[in-house]
Amino acid sequence: MAEEGVFMKYTLAPSLLAADFSELWEELSKAERAGVRFVHFDVMDGSFVPNISFGAPIIRSLRKRSQSFFDVHMMVEEPIRYLEDMKNAGADRVTIHSEAARHLDRSLNRIRELGMQAGLALNPA
């Protein structure tokens, strides 16, 4: 609970995973027209999690047309392998899972070295 006189600030970042993949730009554009300024990308490799989703090429092509903040959630094994690709694709923040990175400290430091914000996802199970 917030202290009296302190306001909590929340940011909503809709995930494009729920979008129609054949119309990603149209879906993102519609969200931006509605006021969305943060967009969440769930990047899955089919190994860390069973599904496969976006990769750097899709993020890069949407970045060319969008000024929104790109929040990239890496659900992949050894995310450090993909960090430069995410930077070059236009990610503003990259969140990784502690259990997916052999050297968590190196991965988080590398995200920051590349000029992105670093996030850490914890599995509550």
Predicted features along the sequence, with ranges:
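Short, Lys/Arg-enriched N-terminal segments with co-localized hydrophobic residues
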Residues: M1-F7
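Alpha-helix-loop-beta-strand connector modules within alpha/beta enzyme cores
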Residues: I52-V72, R110-G119
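Conserved, mostly hydrophobic/aromatic
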Residues: L24, A31, D42, M86
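Catalytic cores of alpha/beta
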Residues: L28, I80-N88
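Glycine-rich, proline-tolerant flexible connector loops at the mouths of alpha/beta enzymes
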Residues: V39-A56
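A structural motif
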Residues: R33-F38, Q67, A91
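Conserved anion-binding
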Residues: D20-E23, R65, R81-Y82, A91-A125
